[in-house]
Every structure is written in structure tokens, then in C-alpha cells.
């Protein structure tokens, strides 16, 4: 057990959990980033609810949300870290895991401060439906992200997280990676989005996405994919200039992503001038069993229809 407050020790142990032979592309890094993202992206500025406080995915109301399907793996991978450092809250652990994963996969350093607390029951878990739906378009992205307090530039910067990981048909309904090296943080997502010919494809489950098939690729190689929301970034006149800038300038993208992600994981957190959290509506909670639905190997896919996606 480490000394309370030894976050460097926690960082080291998170980094030690990244290598996962047999899991997606051999790395837990992308799922740690998604865990930090989804645990923070429920924030609603108007009501000041949701956000990175609480670790609500420990409860069925949030953890069982189909939008969070697959994140049970990320939470399980971090349990040995929690057991070794029982003083850290889940909400701090999950957000820190995303920060460490991005840095370890070659991404920018992201400011992170501790102090989040965990819900002791599910009474403050935010309602479902606050996370982005990849089957939608530009209007949906603005509705979701403006609600949290982000602008168009920050929306595009955060979308660069799609340099990491892959989609799974039994989770989101979509299938495949965005880039050829989904465990290395880069600006490749933006380059591919602009330069490749993305063709619509309807999967066997009825979900529509966009794919690029390299004619020179080996037969066993998986085609790359883009979500309808990704293609909307390319086609929207206000989003596209940022896509173009990030495709050309990796350093600019890294700088903007770092700032936007730091803002994301602070949503719902109030601090004084010293950085101490001043939220008073929460106390530190203990361990809670993983939610039933999201404790299964895979969760149910989000409801999508080819007809709705085709309208984008």
C-alpha cells in the first residue's frame, strides 16, 4: 500500500496495466481514455450535474448504459491499482488513468488534479442519453458538446481521441479501428479523414458507418472506419478548418487536445485558488459491485438504424 497522496506511485501502476496481450490490439490504453471520457462527458452546465465527480459507473443506472458497454473491461483492469492504493477515489483513478494512457501512448502531457469524490448511492447519477451518438451529425455534436461548455474548435480537438482504439459491433454497433496504429497517439485520424475516400457501408447489424479499404492491403487486414459524426467534422464548414489545421500541424493538435481533455476531466468540479475541491454535495464512497449489465463481457449495442444514419 502506498502513502495517501502518492499519485506518482498510482501513475506507475496504471502504466504497468497498459500492456494486455489478448485484449484489443494488446493494450488497455484506449479503453482507459474512453473510461475517463465517458465518466466526465455526462456534464450539463445548465443544471451543473454530471461530470467527473462520483464514479457513477459503479451503479447500474450509469454503468449499465449501453453507451458505456465495454467499459467494464477498463474498470476491471484498474481494480489491482485501486486495491494497491485504496485511498484514491474511483473518480480520481479513472480520470488519471486516461491521462496516463494518453501520455504513455505518445500523446501530450495533460494537467490533472486530484480531489474528486465517489457517490455513496445512485441518487446523483446523471440520466442516460448525455453521451455522443456516433450515428448522428454535426447538429448532434454541437448539442452534446455545447451543453458541456465546449466550442467548435474543442469539439474537433477532442474528436482526435479517435486516433486510439477501435469500435466493436457488440458494444457501440460500429466495427473497426480508425487508424492503422490504434495504440499510438497522433494526428493520423485527421489526415485519413481528409485524404482517404470514405464509402458508406451498412453492417450486418443494420448500422451504417464509413470504410476505407486499401487495395494493396493483405486480405487479413481489417478495413479502417469512420463514424458518421467523424465525416460530419470533415463536411461541416465550421468544423473542417480545424480538421485541416490538425492534419497539418501535430504540435497544434497536441496542444489543443491537452487543453480540451484537461477541461473535460474537470467538468463538474469546483476548486478554490489553491486547487482544492470545494464541492460539498458528496462524500467519499466505498467499493460497490460492478453493475449487472456492464459486468458482462459485452453490453448490448446502442440502438442505431441504417435508415437514421443514411439521413446524415
UniProtKB/Swiss-Prot annotation:
Q: Does the keyword Iron apply?
A: yes
Q: Name one GO biological process term.
A: hydrogen peroxide catabolic process
Q: What is its EC number?
A: 1.11.1.-
Swiss-Prot/TrEMBL cofactor(s): heme b
List the Pfam families hit by this protein, alphabetically: peroxidase
Keyword annotations from UniProtKB, A to Z? Heme, Iron, Metal-binding, Oxidoreductase, Peroxidase
Give the positions the UniProt entry annotates as the active site.
38 (proton acceptor), 178 (tryptophan radical intermediate)
Site (Transition state stabilizer): which residue positions?
Answer: 34
* Region spans: Disordered: 276-312
Residues that hold heme b according to the record: 162
On whether Nuclease is a keyword of this UniProt record, the answer is no
Q: Which GO terms describe its molecular function?
A: heme binding; metal ion binding; peroxidase activity
PROSITE patterns for the chain: PEROXIDASE_2, PEROXIDASE_4
Q: How is the cofactor bound?
A: Binds 1 heme b (iron(II)-protoporphyrin IX) group per subunit.
- Domain of life of the source: Eukaryota
Which PANTHER family does this one have? L-ASCORBATE PEROXIDASE 3, THYLAKOID LUMENAL 29 KDA PROTEIN, CHLOROPLASTIC-RELATED
Give the function comment from the record: Destroys radicals which are normally produced within the cells and which are toxic to biological systems.
Question: Which family does the similarity line name?
Answer: Belongs to the peroxidase family. Cytochrome c peroxidase subfamily.
Supply the name of the protein.
Putative heme-binding peroxidase
